[in-house]
């Protein structure tokens, strides 16, 4: 935690001459950043979403999509960036470990507003900070590796806006069959590869099975074949 405090104290913010909004959290695991980023970015013209591209096979900066046109495959972008690109038909999505380079690239492409997915810890970037606070917070208040926080819990006070799950935003999940909202077959399996999959249980009928893989799991053809064979009498 001391290292985090020192980094924040020494950081000199850089102004980029473009509105930059960070949607982040300070806990380990999912908190709803991606769907909220999609919702916000969809409200603006010439928006750009920048993220690291967790789990991708590539390194460096890649423009995943430009005004909704997909430019790379999911191996290069990572699954989260591809979800953003497919969801935002009029936006640009960039992956890069170096957010500063990505911001400069977004400006070069003519973007007028930038959303940083999980950008709270980028202290050197002058930005408007939105922090999401889940309803189920870690009971251990220490930072990694001892506890469940990535930043000190007191850093919530440093957000420009703090959004509390349950009052400021809610998760609304609809399970669909064949792209249409309808009643699911009684023998259905839900396959997940997200952080904290148990949070889905409250939205599921009790007779649906759930198979959980690690967050951002890269499914192989063998995985899919094994699941289909094991649950051949089930819908997915």
Model-flagged regions — what are they?
Residues 1-18, 28, 218-230:
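N-terminal leader/targeting and accessory segments in enzymes
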Residues 7-68, 72, 171:
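Walker A (P-loop) phosphate-binding motif
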Residues 38, 42, 86, 105-108, ...:
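Short, well-ordered alpha-helices that flank and scaffold nucleotide-derived cofactor binding pockets
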Residues 48-50, 130-131, 187-191:
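Conserved beta-strand elements of the Class I
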Residues 54-168:
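Phosphate/Mg2+-binding loops and adjacent switch elements
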Residues 107-112, 229-235:
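Glycine-rich phosphate-binding loop signature in dinucleotide/nucleotide-binding domains
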Residues 138-233:
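C-terminal accessory "lid"/substrate-recognition subdomains
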